[in-house]
Amino acid sequence: MFVEVPNDYQAIQKIAVKILNEPRSWISVPDHINYFNYSSLRKLLVRVGFKPVKRTTTYPIYALLMMGYNFISNKEAGPKAHQKRVNFELFWDKINLRRIKHLIYWFLSALGMGRTVIYYSKREI
């Protein structure tokens, strides 16, 4: 089974709130009423009978804030931020090093970072 949820309340988001004085833009009530991190999603999967076998993430979009690309305060920067993420994804595919991208995402997930929490799990029998 594949499960992907937003990775909100992660360290890089908290840093953006504190250092850049940005609002907690990831809070979206009533759209999102439950928030997960790697630990809480893993616990849920185990509780309902699944064994997590692999975890990973997606591009850490909030890292762009640390590089001076503020897509939160400047809404016009949103599409450009998205394009930067897409360019990063396509770069690794273009040079036939997709495995490097997967290793980067795995490492980010090991640090609790990345835009999403992704688990591949199998049903415990």
Language-model-detected regions and their locations in the chain:
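A C-terminal cap/extension of S-adenosyl-L-methionine-dependent methyltransferases
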Residues: 57-125
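A SAM-dependent methyltransferase catalytic signature shared across enzymes that methylate proteins
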Residues: 38-58, 90-97
